[in-house]
Amino acid sequence: MVNQNIRRKFRKRTMRRLNTYKLKFLVIFLVVFATTGIFISFFVGTSSVLQSVEKFNSEYNVEDGIFITNDDIDEKFKDISLEQIKNGEVREGGSTVRIFQSRKKINKYQVTSGRDIQNDKEILIDNNYLKANKLALNDELTFNGEKLKIVGTAISPDYITTKNSNLVLQANSEVFGIAFVNEETFQRLFGNEFSSYYAYTSNLDVQEVSKIVKPTYINDSQNNTRIQQVIGDAKAPRDLALLLTCLLYLIVGVLLSVYHFEVSKKESNNLATFNKLGFNKWILFKHYIAETSLTLLIAWLIGGTIGIFLIETIMQMNSQIYNYPILKIDYTLLTECLVFSLAIVLVINFVLVYQFYIKFKKKKNKVKSIRKRSSKIMKFIPFTYRYRLKRINRNKKEMALFIVLIFFVGLLINFSFLLKDSVTNYVDDLASENIFEEILFLNPPNQHDIKGEEFKLYNLHDEDGITQSVYVIGSDSKYYNYNLKLADGDVIITQAFSDKYGKKVGDKLLLKDVTNQKDYSFKINKVNNVTTVSNIYLVSDNGEMFNHETYSVPAVALSNPYDNANDSGIEATLTRNEIITSGKNILDVINKQITLILGLAIVLQVALLYSLLEFSYQNSIKSIKTLKLEGYSLKELMRMHFAFSFPIAVLTIIGSYLLSRIGVRVFLDQIMFDFVNFVRVTDNLNIIFASNGMIIAVFTFFLIRIRSKMKCI
């Protein structure tokens, strides 16, 4: 047993260490606080979104695919469940509302606010369209002469990403929305003038389904960006948060190691005395673990609390581009993360305390024999630099720690800048690459003469089962030539397609029409400069590149907005403005995420560089005092202890830049690799100067601070 007097003295020693190393504890506190907050808010928030969406898809029976057929399907197929999806579009004042008849089995809608439809004078619309167009529940809308009351908002699994077309990256709720009405209302609105397709659920793959239902067109849900995009956009930030958390816990371990190494070094004589006096290991363990455990616990409590309050904000962060179903926090995961986040830092601390204090052994000073090594090269290096090189060689762990911390901070900063600049360039390129004003997708049986550039759009599968957009254009195309001289028979891919799939001029393209089980092979002879979409362009003046049974959508590109009141032959429209604003919407979301990551990176770089340089300075005090007494100037002392730090830091940041480029590519591909849209990672070298500048500026500030402290020794 330890008497009360000893306990009081131990408490005083603990408080003295807290006061002496208060800045180090502040650094540890900030890193643990940030780590816990990010883990709880981002990981739990994004995981909860993913779980809510997947549960919604399951409960409301998301499709496994869709198909179009010219035949009425009455028979029931084995292993396939079907439902006809009916929709019509109302276009007024540049805005389009796609109205669906309520579904009974597949892609059923969920009412997210208000109430469900009760009569044929009511309508449900999606929440984002409601907000973007400044509407409210109980407002009335007039569609095709029918007044309908908005009684609620709703969304279905196939339209969480509520975008007009798969050709755009993100939704634009100001100009496009969806709505649901009952069967009677739908009949009054559209009569027989509506579009339809079949949604199906099945465990069979798309080719097997195609053989059974014999459609004119078929596509599976894996290639439906309206379904997959929201899932990818939840998974990528979740995985990023998990990776970031793991790296931050590594930093926590490093900071605790630095602290315990420094304290145990100063406490070596006291530890030897305590052992001789008979203090058992448990008493010493409790004594030396007290201040760090207290710091970790407070940081965990505050970080966890703030993280919990931020979960809802994180969950709704992408709500402006996705019409989410009702989202619920995964409280089981939250509890597990809270327990794990506390356990991991305490375990790290316990292990380090045991390693540095309990396994303590008094090191005996051994006189090492000096072996003189002659080096002709070293003789030409000034003594101050030779001394620095010797210190680096003898303190390899210190230099390794410096490189790791600089690399980690550089990784965060470069990742943020690269992601922001890449998406910004993507938005700018959307404006320059899309020079048409509007595209009209026509309903083949009801085509009427529209003046514009005609082309056909095919959706065919590649070797990996990914749907590719194939445009059949004329050699006189002005909207799709992209500064190339087109010739009949050209097979052209975009630069984005080349970057994504590694294809180049001379390579073969293998495409499959799963509807008719037709295989097509083409040899690429040109690559255009388009970087925003991974499209294929086939040039044919007679429009014949595929078997006549292969399904295509005829379309017309216009130089001016279509303002003809007669739109009976138009299946859907896509404006240039929709394409551009879809990119701007995602840029807004990316900017919010980047602001958070950059803020974290700046706090970390200040905290880590301070901790690292302070650690290096404390380990150098004896040599600095000795060398100062021998007459070395302050400038020489700085060289002897901190030379080569700047070039090493610069090279490390460049290395982190190269890895960040890979990280951004992986991050973007995880969200949208299967989509036609493509965001190219920027080649802007100014990012290297910006990230280097930020870190070098902070590093210089702390070096000046240490220089002033060396003056006073």
Identify the residue ranges that each predicted region occupies.
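Short cytosolic juxtamembrane segments of multi-pass membrane proteins
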Residues: 357-372, 622, 707-713
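Interfacial "coupling" helices/loops that link adjacent transmembrane helices in transporter permeases
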Residues: 13, 21, 254-293, 607-647
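Juxtamembrane segments of multi-pass membrane proteins
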Residues: 67, 76, 381-500, 504-507, ...
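N-terminal Sec/SRP start-transfer signal
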Residues: 1-37, 289, 293, 369-410, ...
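C-terminal transmembrane helical bundles of large multi-pass transporters
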Residues: 570-669, 673-680, 693, 697, ...
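Membrane transport/envelope proteins' first extracytoplasmic loop
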Residues: 1-253, 262, 419-420, 425-440, ...
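Short helix-loop junctions at transmembrane helix boundaries
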Residues: 301-336, 651-713
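Hydrophobic alpha-helical segments
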Residues: 225-240, 263-366
